[in-house]
Design a protein with these regions (language model features):
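Short, low-complexity disordered leader/linker segments with a strong preference
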Residues: 1-39
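Short beta-strand-centered segments that line the small-molecule binding cleft or hinge
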Residues: 82, 86-89, 107-113
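A conserved helix-loop-strand patch within extracytoplasmic ligand-binding domains
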Residues: 111-161
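Immediate post-signal peptide segment of exported/extracytoplasmic ligand-binding proteins
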Residues: 27-41, 60, 129-135
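Beta->alpha turn/N-cap motifs
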Residues: 70-74, 84, 88-98, 188-189, ...
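Short helix-initiation/N-cap motifs at beta->coil->alpha
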Residues: 68-79, 166-194
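Short, polar/charged alpha-helical segment
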Residues: 39, 45-70, 76
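Ligand-binding "clamshell"
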Residues: 99-111, 124-126, 198, 203, ...
């Protein structure tokens, strides 16, 4: 068990404990679908399954059973909460949630935080960002929040320049300078890792890269939260 795993586990434990406390203090009553099992159902992303399962085992000591439901995309967990199929989800940034609510008018509320996810720039074909060719193909997520995170990281790496670095919803239309004429390919966030072997550069999430077994997640040109 690595130090990073232990530190993240503590952060997730705090977050899930807050979820448990929230439902308990609010006088949470299980619906008929939960009546027999007394289970608090929480939606998560696959890369965090092992970590969060260990946390759920700890939360069990507080008297509430936690069932983790894995979702392969980042849209379904919020839909599931909105529809009442699960009790909560635990996978997204506050900016991502705010944008989802703005786009869908879902009645969702944030009440717990956990460990933040690192993101980075990765390439199989090139050893440095300077060696990227003109019109290099760069794979970024297609959701507004993580697409902006990718562009901001590319700006900080000196590959492009954005109109406003503080705009958390920047799009490719906000690029004011692109010296290498980078070509952007947008895919669903969880799938950027699968483009590692073919693209010139990807904006990747270490947990997904590790799960896809395509590269060492620590071998990034830039790695940040």
């Amino acid at each position: 068990m690595t130090q990073s795993f232990i530190q993240n586990r503590k952060k997730w434990l705090i977050g899930l404990s807050i979820i448990v406390a929230f439902f308990s203090l609010a006088g949470y009553r299980y619906s008929k679908s939960h009546a027999q099992d007394d289970v608090l159902t929480i939606g998560i992303s696959p890369p965090y399954a092992e970590l969060l399962q260990s946390v759920a085992d700890e939360v069990k000591k507080q008297g509430i059973q936690v069932k983790l439901v894995e979702f392969s995309d980042w849209h379904a967990p919020n839909v599931a909460v909105q529809n009442g199929d699960i009790d909560a989800n635990f996978f997204q940034q506050s900016v991502f949630l705010s944008n989802a609510i703005r786009e869908t008018n879902y009645d969702l509320h944030a009440f717990a935080t956990g460990a933040g996810s690192h993101v980075g720039l990765y390439s199989k074909k090139y050893k440095s960002l300077d060696s990227l060719p003109t019109q290099a193909r760069v794979v970024i997520p297609n959701d507004p929040v993580n697409s902006a995170r990718a562009l901001i990281l590319l700006h900080r790496a000196g590959l492009i320049q954005l109109k406003d670095l503080n705009n958390e919803l920047s799009t490719v239309q906000d690029i004011v300078s692109n010296p290498k004429q980078l070509q952007f390919i947008e895919v669903e966030g969880p799938h950027t890792a699968h483009a590692f072997n073919d693209a010139d550069l990807i904006f990747g999430f270490p947990h997904y890269l590790k799960m896809a077994k395509v590269t060492d997640p620590h071998h990034a040109f830039f790695l940040t939260r």
